[in-house]
Amino acid sequence: YVFNNTEHAANLFGLRELGNIYTRLMNPTTDVLEQRVAALEGGAAGLGVASGTSGVFYSIINLAQEGDEIVSANNLYGGTYTQFNDILPKFGINVKFVDPNDPQNYAAAITDKTKALFCESVSNPGLDVADLEAIAKVASDHGIPLIVDSTFSTPYLTNPIEHGASIVVHSLTKWLGGHGNGIGGVVIDSGTFDWKNGNFPLYDEPDNSYHGLRWGHDLPEPLAPVAFILRMRTVPLRNLGACISPDNSWQFLQGIETLPLRMDRHCENALAV
């Protein structure tokens, strides 16, 4: 948390360069965690948050606003289903639920108000496996991102970005952490989605909450690919505050060290059963 001079400080706050400015937004320990999970997922950037549930919520409100729609699989973790079915509508965001076993169900539910598709790579608790490539193609054909909660498969077993997902969410509390000693979540940005395609007013119009910045247009070229994560960091996270404890970030970094050993054993046990 060093400002070399006033120009350096202005550049940090103006997002002309990256650095630690305030621990709710950026923390050195959490930064290591974000980079490590992003590397495991093959993503461009990550954002640590207080829980997987807050990661899902921030992912939605970071691209959708009142009057918009999300199309989601119906076989979701109960907390996510409640968030989508009961909470988001109070913010004016409507979620349409579809049977994900036929990816064309997503296509049939998309309208000009749809801002994203959502699914879980392996559903919680039903263990249904999503056809990520097929769902991602539907999203791509309509110029919208696919958001995947990949908590149950972890990056050791599945990399949704390789199959076309734009955003990946994890509850770190479960298999990535592995030891039940912390609560947290992380959102990974693939860095490949075009937020300037005309479908996202939140990225085209000036943001009054951040000096009139247009997230899809005004970032310097090195930062433009991770506009989604930068906006999530400086709008929802900064202003709503569901930040991860740096101590929990450290605990998750220790847990990730044993992820391959634990996932191999989980798979061996499952095959035996």
Which stretches of residues belong to each language-model region?
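Structured loops at beta-to-helix junctions and adjacent beta-edge loops in soluble globular domains
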Residues: 1-2, 255
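Conserved PLP-enzyme active-site core in the AAT-like
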Residues: 45-273
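Conserved N-terminal alpha-helix of the aminotransferase class I/II PLP-enzyme fold
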Residues: 3-54, 79-87
